[in-house]
Amino acid sequence: KNLNCCFIQWKKKRRMLEYRRQRTDKEKEEQMTRQIITCRGLPFWSWNGKLEENELRRQIRIFREMGFGGFFIHARTGLATDYLGKEWFEALRVSIDEARKVGLQPWLYDEDRYASGSGAGEIGKNIHFRRRSVEVKVLKEPEYRTDDLAWFAGKLSGTMLAEPRRLETGADLRPGESFLRFYVKFAEADSWNNGGYYSDMMNPDAMREFIRMTHEHYAAEFGEEFGSVIPGLFTDEPNCSTWTENMEQKFEARYGVPLLDHLPELFFEVDGCECSKIRWQMANLRAELLESAFAVPVSEWCRKHGLLYTGHVFGEENTVTQTKNTGSVMRFVRHMDIPGLDVLSDHQLIYEAVLQTASVARQNGTSRVLSESFAGSGWDLPLFAQKAGMDWQYALGVTVFCVHHAFYTLRGEAKRDFPPGISFQSPYWKQAGGGRRGGRGGASAACGSSAGIDLVLEASGRLFAEGSRDGDAPPAASAQRSAPGGDRIRLRRRAYDGGKRFHRERAAPDWKG
């Protein structure tokens, strides 16, 4: 009797365990299916010609046939329709309608070309919002100008400055001294910004104007589609220069130190000191200003309007380029719902950047990490190289690929705009299956565990103090000497050079990566 009772209890327990296992397997399968849909590739759809309804609808159906999950609508070189004009919004309306019909997600992009934040060059036309930098000119004789920041004298030898002293107007030099003239240089108008200017992305008023003329315009036209048909918005390559309006007042308010008295430390090793507290404070302040002026308000605007915020910053390749262009990549992308990065070409091995971005995603509690990939790889980029480039990123935590890019047209200079093209202009587009494979690979990375590090500690402070003179990257030898991980930088450069040689000489289509 006791044996029978034990046997019955064992059978019940076994059935319960089997039920739980089946339920767990079913839940995992359902989770995997959901992730495959959300992790499918999203190409940059380059609007670079005269936009016409029938052609827009045709190309969206091609994206569906290729297995993509959606697309980023991206104004690019060659656009013959007025950006943010009446025809632009009509083309968007057509594209959103067709995407809804075929089950794709149309994502917005916040700029004409890139980098985000200049409003097609319009914002910088207000000189208060214009990009600027702090510069130094070394002269043998004094040259005093009324609009300069400050003047110094000192004994200069290469990057070493000894016995610097601040000068007043009309002061003479002593024997052996050089004259250092510090001034602000404003960005010039250029064709890339349609005859306008790059904006100052550390200026909160400039970025409020950017949101008003771009984001609010989209909300007025398509706000009812936000969060449903239109899932989110892409920001591309925001970055900061070395100066902003009232920088000296902001610096003193933040640190209690008069910045103008210490300008030489931004450019030179003063009295033999490689490290400078002023240099560290300046790099840190630039990162804080970019974050508070750009990342925070755009992120808050997106959440208020039901949009996911994604994209990447400029110069995330390593800590040297990050210090120069943003101060800190991780501080910026932590405000994104889907943190991202840009892996240019098919042999740029920026492992640190991928690990940093994946670490931010984990800290934010999300599994989605976006990579804009393959820009500049050339028209001859083979499928096996694309697979290899995606696989190592999956292993380190990337789950969604923004494939660069799908040309609307190849007319004129558009064909030279950072190929390859992955849409119907490429002979292998029907065989590529990048969208479907991207969904499976991304889902595996999202549901499983990557080979990457769970947490990345960004040790940027030393580089802020040692290697960020004028917010610029130091010479290669200095960068390798002063930056943490200098040996890894050298190894990566050798791998990069080897990759270039491999792709010039490739003759092995069966290469397994």
Predicted feature locations:
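Catalytic and substrate-binding clefts that recognize carbohydrates or anionic sugar/phosphate headgroups
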Residues: 118-223
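Generic start-of-chain signal for non-secretory N-termini
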Residues: 17-47
